[in-house]
A protein has these predicted regions:
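Generic alpha-helical structural signal
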Residues: 88, 152-155, 201
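Acidic, divalent-metal-coordinating active-site segment for phosphoryl/phosphodiester hydrolysis
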Residues: 11, 146-157
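A residue-level signal for conserved active-site and pocket-lining positions in enzyme catalytic cores
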Residues: 83, 150, 154, 193
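Acidic two-metal-ion nuclease catalytic site recognized across multiple nuclease folds
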Residues: 157-224
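Short amphipathic alpha-helical interaction segments
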Residues: 145-146, 196
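Conserved non-catalytic scaffold segment of RNase H-like nuclease domains
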Residues: 1-113, 117-145
Length: 224
């Protein structure tokens, strides 16, 4: 398959994946299409207890994953693109099971921030905004933070973003995502909130020497 929209729920922040869901998607005649009949959604066990903080978000209990296959048994399908809301988090999670997984990452969170800069950007808020607070949206959102529901809501938001940007193929979507992920302002440190182009050159030089520098921030700093 060419692309999947994927979401994970983890046992703790940046933890083991205990629920993984994905749905195949593609562009047909220039329109983003998802195959709802092919949704994958499974629970997995892990070697550590689910934190109560994580439990409060996704409502997955120890009893839900008892007797389930280990997360280590998961293998992502071969695909060229992987799409998700803050997709880097999900890629990190599934690589705990499948370290060799590789695909071009498309981040709907970055795209939403670019297209709707003045809105809240979590999936639930975006769905409410795009449906003008409809009852149908509320019905769907009440199940949000279930991985399966999250991929379906992400697909809904992404279809509208593609329409707003005139995107008609997956490679163009990827390129828009790459551009959207390059920050225009610094989000931490002594110059937090400052436009990248206005950061003093000595601070830029220092940042560029940091070993854990975000690759997209690095692009922004080099571009200036």
């Amino acid at each position: 398959m060419s692309a999947i929209i994927l979401d994970t729920e983890t046992h703790d922040m940046k933890g083991y994946p205990i629920e993984i869901a994905y749905i195949p998607c593609s562009f047909i005649d220039g329109l983003l299409t998802v195959d709802k009949q092919a949704v994958y959604d499974e629970y997995f066990s892990c070697p550590e207890p689910i934190s109560y903080g994580a439990m409060a978000v996704h409502h997955i209990l120890e009893s839900d994953i008892a007797g389930k296959p280990s997360f280590e048994t998961f293998r992502a399908p071969a695909c060229e693109y992987i799409i998700g809301h803050n997709i880097d988090y999900d890629i990190e999670a599934i690589r705990k099971a499948d370290p060799e997984f590789k695909a071009k990452a498309i981040c709907t969170l970055a795209l939403a921030r670019m297209v709707y800069p003045d809105q809240a950007h979590n999936i639930s808020a975006l769905v409410y905004m795009l449906t003008s607070g409809s009852e149908k949206a509320r019905e769907s959102i009440r199940n949000a933070h279930n991985a399966k529901q999250d991929v379906l809501l992400t697909a809904f938001v992404l279809k509208i973003i593609c329409n707003d940007l005139g995107i008609k193929d997956m490679q163009s979507l990827y390129l828009f995502s790459e551009q959207a992920r390059i920050p225009t302002h610094i989000t931490f440190g002594k110059y937090k909130g400052t436009a990248i182009k206005d950061i003093p050159s000595d601070y830029v030089s220092w940042l560029l020497k940091q070993p854990d520098l975000d690759p997209y921030l690095k692009k922004a700093l080099i571009k200036g």
